[in-house]
Amino acid sequence: MDKVRTVSDSKRDFYTKHTRPINSVYRRVVEELMVEMHLLSVNSDFQYDPVYALGVVTSFQRFMQGYRPDADKESIFNALCQSVGGDPQQYRQDAERMIESAKQLSAQQLLFNLESASDSSSGENQILQTLIGIANAPKYKYTRLFAIGIYTILAETDPEMLKNTEKREEVVKQIAKVLHLPEEKMQKDLDLYRSNLEKMDQLLTVIEEALQADRKKREQQKIMDN
């Protein structure tokens, strides 16, 4: 019987693959995402899909905004995926395909086709193919990262709708119902995601203001020294 990999195994693999130090604020983001992905990778009910991949890629991109040096982000993402047995290129490609497919749909078209929930209604749209497959599956392991993938798709199909709490929650409710997912948990996960994005944006603003103040101070000091 194969030994089940532990979180420590994944962390060790990660830091073997990405050897440069990670800023403390961002290290927490990376490690929390790694733990979440690890726990799913060893869960027998979990099955990778492109919407989940989009959630992973989006979470990484949004919460790693402002990371310096910027060139390190690719190495960090690669190590993150590989540490849980994933292929970073597959994650990126699947996420890109989901975004491209989302651009071909409106939120109304997405819901209409999902509610019909037949393979024939999906056409060649990969989002519909993926989601209708999930709707028709005998069981599906819901994840927070899948919910973020759905949110990212909705942001592409109808960004204005997401700004309206009532409309956003109604659409999420309908999607959860069609896909047989826990609606209340999905709503809470997305509320927390939105809240964390706002906090991250505020933190980035504070960091940028501090950097500007430091640059200004150095410039003034340089003038005085001359």
UniProtKB/Swiss-Prot annotation:
Q: What is the designated name of this protein?
A: Protein Thf1
Q: Which GO terms describe its biological process?
A: photosystem II assembly
* Family of the protein in this entry: Belongs to the THF1 family.
Matching entries from Pfam families are given as:
ThylakoidFormat
Q: Which HAMAP family match?
A: Thf1 (MF_01843)
What does this protein do, in the record's words?
May be involved in photosynthetic membrane biogenesis.
Cellular component per GO?
A: plasma membrane-derived thylakoid photosystem II
List the PANTHER family: PROTEIN THYLAKOID FORMATION 1, CHLOROPLASTIC
Give the keywords, sorted: Coiled coil
Coiled-coil zones: 183-213
